Amino acid sequence: LMFSLEMPHQQLVMRLLAQLSGIDYQALRAGRIPEDKYTEYYAALDRLDSLDIIIDDSPAITPAYVSSTVKNHMADGKLDAIFLDSLNLMKSGIRIDRKFEEIDYCATELKNVARENNIPVWVAHQMNRGIDYRGNESRPTLADLREGGEQPADVVMFIYHDRADDKSINSSSLIIAKQRNGPTGEIPVYFRANAFRFESAAKARL
């Protein structure tokens, strides 16, 4: 189940097709699929259909709305995971004056949804803009999360690209900055920009 506050349903599906097929996103948008990519395209359509992804792009999503929607879907059949993009666009649904308090409230309520339904909840969240002005010291930390929200999280991960490294603009790191029940650290990854897809660095070298 995917709650998308960042982009509409159609745009999200197009990006998923690009990720699954490896076909250039702009080519998919324009309907110009290379003839030698039709096999990958139809395989991606079949794969997307088999994943049975439910996308909810309702505006002004609140924790209460997420909770009730999850319960309704759980009654119809088990959900494997919940994704939400993004935390900073959520509304609390109650009166909270300060934005960081609203973010913390929403994050805590989403944690409750995860525990009540015994299901993982993955939440995207923005970084503070100040990180862009730190030059070569721009490696993200928990303090860089915009308006907080990290306290209730079991795991916090960042995607980081060292802009001082000109060897490969697509080489990045998955930083595990917090893990309540496990180790932290970094994993090298490779970003295929035309398909909006991250891969393990080892796989990308093959």
Can you name each region flagged by the protein language model?
Residues L1-K78, S92, E186-Y190:
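Cytosolic-facing regulatory segments adjacent to core modules
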